């Protein structure tokens, strides 16, 4: 990451985040002052927040589909016969 070159020969996608974080760390008194910049850099590298959000959306969609299918099964066509 130190060189700034990505695999395609251009600037790496997270290089700007790294430079901001690195500059903050070299000038700050407390490392916690750079926490937000660190989070931005790590999110750029790993996309963990994005994946968590996508997973929550997927689970909610699946929950709604299950609820709709259960509701459809319960209402059915209204002709429940017991023998």
UniProtKB/Swiss-Prot annotation:
Intervals of motif Cx9C motif 2: 34-44
Top-level taxon of the source organism: Eukaryota
Ranges of residues in domain CHCH: 11-52
Motif (Cx9C motif 1): 14-24
Keyword Lyase: no
PROSITE patterns xrefs: CHCH (PS51808)
Signal peptide positions on this chain: none
Membrane-related topology note: Peripheral membrane protein
One Gene Ontology term, aspect cellular component: mitochondrion
Disulfide bond positions: 14-44, 24-34
Stretches for region Disordered: 62-83
Keywords recorded for this protein, A-Z: Disulfide bond, Electron transport, Membrane, Mitochondrion, Mitochondrion inner membrane, Respiratory chain, Transport
Subcellular location: Mitochondrion; Mitochondrion inner membrane; Mitochondrion intermembrane space
Matching Pfam families: Ndufs5
Role played: Accessory subunit of the mitochondrial membrane respiratory chain NADH dehydrogenase (Complex I), that is believed not to be involved in catalysis. Complex I functions in the transfer of electrons from NADH to the respiratory chain. The immediate electron acceptor for the enzyme is believed to be ubiquinone.
Subunit and partners: Complex I is composed of at least 49 different subunits. This is a component of the iron-sulfur (IP) fragment of the enzyme.
Family: Belongs to the complex I NDUFS5 subunit family.
Domain characteristics, as noted in the entry: Contains two C-X9-C motifs that are predicted to form a helix-coil-helix structure, permitting the formation of intramolecular disulfide bonds.
Protein name (database record): NADH dehydrogenase [ubiquinone] iron-sulfur protein 5-B
